[in-house]
Amino acid sequence: DGGNRQFILVTNNENNICEEVTYPRIKKVIEGYNDKKGIPANVKYFKTDYVPYVITDNDKRTLVSKSTELLCISENTFEVIKQNIKKMDFAIFKNAKQYTAIIYDEDSIENCCDELIKINPKHKVVIYVFSYDHSYDELDFETLNFKFDVKPIPEAILNVYRKISKLKRK
């Protein structure tokens, strides 16, 4: 396979096996040891958390902010280009072949587009937009002069949580 490998390791972290053993070992292999050179790779570590039942628009916004990592996993874009944790207006991530923009607030579409124009991506761009009613329009992105796809959020994520909630209530 030419050494091009990807994997996702999932554990309940019993006895802190992931935090104290597995993750540090993988990280050391990547970074290298005193007598051994590292390898060109990366590792990401995520913890899951319970997200309460989604009812209000504010709950939806919280869910979207907690789903950022899921969208990055989905698009395989982990390198942070722009992210304002406090403001939560938009974030931009990339890998060698693609950019992912996540817009948490429709009022930030223009600012995100301005930032993307500054970056001037040479690769595919996927833009996720949080919208209560899908009221954004392709025209909102008319200033972009590169290839991009716009996808709504959190509807797909909310649908998963709706299914889970139905199962829990049965």
Describe the predicted segments one by one.
Residues G2-K170:
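Accessory, often C-terminal, charged low-complexity segments
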